[in-house]
Amino acid sequence: MNGVDFITGQFYFHGKPLSGNAPCWGMSLKSAGNMSFRWNELNSLREKFLRERAEGKQVCAVELIHSHTVYAVDSVSELNDLQGDGIITQNRNLMPVVTVADCMPIFLYEPVNGVFGTLHSGWKGTGIVCDAIVKAEQTFGCDRRNFCVVMGPHIHDCCYRIDEERAQYFRVNFTPDCVKEKDGAFYLSLAQANRHALLELGVCDDNIVCSTECTCCSERFGSFRRQTAGLPPDMSLEEKRQYFTVQAAWVRW
């Protein structure tokens, strides 16, 4: 189901969509407005939007820091004032939420134990999905082979230009296939890097789905790269915050 200002989708298990007794994932669009989140800031627009999407569930979030930190929780209060980039849970009354603006939202569901969650995965956090799955195995007794993974809309290698040092890092630590070179420039596929990491971990290939939509190409998404492209290069990230649209991404029963 899609709305005017958000999209939703299903998980896939052995290549088949899960419907009925399964959660779905969702992501706000640029038209929904800025969904940025910090513990010391009030964002009434975000609160109203997520309250409507939650339909009675409790929204749980962490302040993002581009890390590999994932929390396994059973209540909203466990996350108070915490920073990190992922939330997993078995509690169907919770709706884990992260924010993205070109970075990859990753949605998880393990149908055997009912574990689900949401992750924020930029280039620094590439591989956080593996950390989350291992944490779910340790905490909830999950099996990595049962995990369904959806990589949501994010900046693709058509637009994600990186420097040579970062290109080499990804070639060595993930797979050479995740970097392409064109006219002396390097472009990164976050999808290829994360898929490689998941397959190496033992997640089934036909349980992995990746969105084909590039947030930098498509005007319906907020995009740090696209929306800040014309700003002075010496402007700080904090100053740039007002110029790009942060989106919310969630999983909900």
Task: Give, region by region, the residue ranges found by the protein language model.
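Active-site microenvironment for binding and transforming phosphate-containing groups
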Residues: 1-253
